[in-house]
């Protein structure tokens, strides 16, 4: 059996990213043979009040960030940036959220450096028949919905518990929407509707305290999108404008993105309305959509709407997010470190390999980036 070493990065090149991949409190719980293959970045647990000396008995050792990225067989780094990938070399494995489909430069670096990318975003528990069961990081997705709503309400100076009664509509119904609804309810916003493409009766595990509504969308023409209400079919944009808070939790198909609102639509919104874009894909969902940062988390659309689009919002609740992500990752430490044969034997890992030794495995990368299907995957 192959025995790879794991370099666990504690700092991030991404602005204000504070999550760790493994929670310091979980390291003592790992099997001894796994701990012997784990090297941490210096000061790994400092933000959690845990010194290196306290973690030393539970890992092989410590190294600098640069050394770990350059020498580890497997680099565990949740939010890799271009500079991180550029510092890696042929044969290494990057395990994190590379989001290569929409990142042409990172993809090119991975091809050129002949890297293997195991993508958190593609790690799912699969049923025996091969169908989708549950996303491995579904709790992180819930925290994304929760954190985005929490942070956006803070920035807008709003709560549903005091002041004018607020109403909200959440677009989509997955883990992020569940987290968004949890945050809205926790902060006194009880008039909440959830829009889903499925028939309301076909939604599994609905949240019983919210109103579920079906909507249908005409690609390329938001004017023809409708919500089915007790009054009949209503135009989507007008329906959204009746609410104080709109939360977008849609998992977009990059080959066929949906747009729910254009800048012309915001004039119908009440002044001070809030659009919380948990999905925050550039140009998708809303015509003006773009990811924002913790340093500059919102901007105004028209004269009426505040738009929030921080695309790594779980970092707002970094301690809780680290705990959930660590719990999700730990079962996969052993198969990842046992190498390619173990990856191939585990559907969660084999189906999450986006690029393998510089070869593109995920066809969505080719389609979205307009690349040739043959190596070296030239842009066409």
Where do the language-model regions lie?
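Short glycine-/small-residue-rich Rossmann-like dinucleotide-binding loops
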Residues: 73, 79-80, 98-99, 250-254, ...
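Glycine-rich phosphate/diphosphate-binding loop of Rossmann-like nucleotide-binding domains
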Residues: 10-45, 151-248
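Rossmann-like adenosine-cofactor binding region
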Residues: 201-303
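A short helix->loop->beta-strand "cap" motif at the edges of active sites that frequently abuts
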Residues: 36, 89-93, 113-115, 189, ...
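Adenosine-phosphate binding glycine-rich loop
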Residues: 121-123, 127-162, 274, 279-380
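Short acidic-hydrophobic, aromatic-tinged amphipathic segments that line or gate anion-handling sites
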Residues: 60-65, 118, 226-231
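Glycine/serine-rich phosphate-binding loop and adjoining beta1-alpha1 elements at the start
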Residues: 2-5, 10-13, 83-167, 310-312
């Amino acid at each position: 059996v192959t025995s790879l070493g794991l370099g666990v990065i504690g700092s991030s090149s991404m602005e204000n990213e504070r999550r760790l991949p493994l929670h310091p409190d979980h390291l003592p719980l790992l099997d001894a043979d796994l701990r012997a293959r784990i090297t941490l970045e210096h000061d790994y647990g400092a933000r959690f009040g845990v010194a290196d000396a306290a973690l030393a008995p539970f890992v092989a050792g410590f190294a600098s960030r640069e050394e770990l990225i350059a020498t580890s067989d497997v680099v565990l780094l949740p939010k890799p940036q271009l500079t991180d990938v550029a510092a890696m070399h042929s044969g290494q494995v990057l395990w994190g959220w590379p989001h290569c489909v929409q990142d042409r430069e990172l993809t090119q670096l991975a091809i050129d450096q002949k890297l293997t990318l195991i993508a958190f975003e593609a790690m799912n528990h699969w049923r025996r028949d091969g169908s989708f069961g549950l996303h491995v990081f579904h709790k992180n997705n819930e925290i994304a919905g929760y954190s985005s709503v929490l942070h956006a309400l803070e920035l807008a100076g709003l709560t549903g518990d005091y002041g004018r009664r607020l109403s909200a509509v959440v677009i989509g119904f997955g883990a992020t929407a569940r987290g968004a609804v949890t945050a809205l309810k926790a902060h006194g916003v009880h008039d909440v509707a959830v829009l889903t493409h499925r028939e309301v009766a076909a939604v599994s595990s609905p949240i019983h305290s919210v109103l579920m509504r079906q909507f249908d969308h005409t690609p390329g023409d938001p004017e023809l999108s409708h919500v089915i209400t007790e009054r009949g079919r209503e135009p989507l944009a007008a329906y959204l404008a009746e609410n104080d808070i709109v939360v977008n939790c849609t998992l977009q198909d990059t080959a066929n993105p949906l747009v729910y609102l254009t800048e012309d639509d915001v004039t119908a919104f009440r002044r001070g309305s809030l659009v919380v874009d948990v999905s925050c894909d550039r140009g998708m969902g809303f015509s003006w959509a773009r990811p924002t940062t913790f340093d500059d988390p919102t901007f105004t659309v028209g004269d009426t709407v505040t738009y929030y689009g921080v695309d790594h919002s779980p970092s707002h609740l970094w301690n809780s997010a680290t705990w959930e992500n660590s719990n999700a990752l730990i079962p996969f430490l052993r198969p990842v470190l046992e190498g390619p044969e173990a990856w191939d034997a585990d559907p969660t890992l084999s189906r999450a390999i986006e690029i393998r030794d510089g070869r593109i495995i995920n066809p969505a990368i080719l389609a979205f980036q307009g690349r040739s299907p043959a190596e070296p995957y030239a842009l066409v």
